[in-house]
Amino acid sequence: MPNETLQNQIASLPENPGVYLMKNAQGEIIYVGKAAVLKDRVKSYFVPPSRLTPKTCQLVSQINELEYLITGSEQEALILELNLIKRHRPYFNVRLKDDKGFPYLKITLNEKWPRIYITRSMADDGGRYFGPFANTRSVRHTLQVLKELFRFRSCNRTEPEKHSRPCLEYDIHQCLSPCTGKISKSDYDHLISQAILFLEGKQDQVLKLLIRLMNEASARLDYETAALRRDQIASIKEVIEGQQLAARVTGEQDAIAFAQEGDLSMVQVFFIRRGKLIGRESFCLQGTREEKPGDILSEFAKQFYHSSTQIPPKIVTQYPVSDREILEKWLSQRRGDKVHITAGLRGQPKELINIVAENAREQLKQARIKNLSSSVTLTDALAELQTALGLSLPPQRIEGYDISNIQGTNAVGSMVVFENGKPQKAHYRRFRIKTVKGADDFSMLKEVISRRFGRVHREDAGESFARLPSLMLIDGGKGQLSSVKETLDKLGLEGQAVIGLAKEFEEIYLPHKSEPIRLAANSPALQLLQRVRDEAHRFALGYHLHIRQKSGLTSALDGIPGVGPSRRRLLIKTFGSVAGIRQASFEKLSQVKGINQALALSIKELL
């Protein structure tokens, strides 16, 4: 029940569009929202708790004070909301993680001899900006490609023409030395124009222009210039070949999809210009727990395009976005031309979104692994597991188990081992299911556990089987856990610690406990368990595909998302065999027509 002051504030709210700010007892802004009608929107929070999500219930319980700002339209409210979220970073808002100062590329068109460099701020100074980029690594790579292609100056001298001797960058072919008159002003300006076209995704235009300039230089016997153009042409062709998408796309568009775990979402954006992938960026969103997919995409789009220097005419999203009409109106105003937002639910847009979503899932997994890479984090994770699960010691050795089959055929099981939080691949083991007929995962798990622990006391057990785990992790919920616990009891291992991790809600099940344990999404302990479970799944799936191939039912390439019959034939033709594909480097795979970097990554991981 709101306090008296809050009730009076709610009662006096106007029926205008605007922005509302919710504060806690300490005066901290904990949520910022916009509304077409302030009174109706704010009153919708103060309803019976059964009609609210747990996250909204938690927000409402902390509201102590309310402020609002009236705007002339809902579009003005959207812009004001964005600025307030960026300034205050309220806890309950969906917000970009570490969004302070994303890097941009700046072209100093206000200078006589323009430079291109990285900056974290934009100013109305006559420069041209491209971005934002998600991290400095990606923007540095782009800058390096530009430098190799166009050899613009990087020094910050205000009067470079006064220097008579070229610097080291000229000697190593990284600068055309305008400071010594090695290039005319018109030629240098032309070069910068090409760099801008390149950043806009118009590499085809740059390529045609360079071919013409090379031929003209050759015709006038200017072989040095012709050789420079030839090298630029070769470099651009290499870039274009790496931009081919597995999905057939045309025109200019951004494709946006995300993967979510609890309170954290990883958003992937593909930038497509003239049917080619000219770049992609990943962004972390915080505060997404219990948020609707359309709301997550809407909040990201607002925050991303608020600071983006390039807005395409079309944006394809994984799900229909909330506030689509007002977003389109706002983006169209920013672009100066019509912008359409559409959900990729079928056909070619769905094919494209599936690729983007797969990249988002991979980026989220890599972020989780990176977060667990430090010994301090791993120690924290193991200590948290000890406390949460009631173990006597931190689990030094964790074994993860999973089953893989299709309707009971070619069924296999996997065992992966993590010691002190790190995978020990030499101890991984796989099992071909021998006694179970049909699709009975529970019985298959029983067989795997019986065979694994039946070897503990055998002389030929080996180090992997001779040692008992501190903790067993089963991929599944109550049913799978009960089957395994029953098997362990029959083997006389009643005291063996075992848990199940159910994927849908990431809940941890313990024997003899009716309610699962729920850890925070950013918990090191949960992230470690997720990594063990995912590794067991990957190892089981890889063995299952191998068995299917040997039985003649399929190629090992089957089951890899995005690899259909035509791409499978092309890969076999290029590398000769599945073994040749397996041995090919990531770079070689990425160069095959129709195989983009995301698909090459999937092939390397699953083959």
UniProtKB/Swiss-Prot annotation:
GIY-YIG domain boundaries: 15-94
Keyword DNA damage in annotation: yes
Top-level taxon of the source organism: Bacteria
GO MF annotation, one: DNA binding
Domain UVR stretches: 204-239
Subcellular location: Cytoplasm
GO biological process: nucleotide-excision repair; SOS response
Pfam families named in the record: GIY-YIG, HHH_5, UVR, UvrC_RNaseH, UvrC_RNaseH_dom
GO cellular component, one term: excinuclease repair complex
Complexes and interactors: Interacts with UvrB in an incision complex.
Protein task: The UvrABC repair system catalyzes the recognition and processing of DNA lesions. UvrC both incises the 5' and 3' sides of the lesion. The N-terminal half is responsible for the 3' incision and the C-terminal half is responsible for the 5' incision.
Protein family (similarity comment): Belongs to the UvrC family.
Protein name: UvrABC system protein C
Lineage, uppermost ranks: Bacteria, Bacillati, Chloroflexota, Dehalococcoidia, Dehalococcoidales
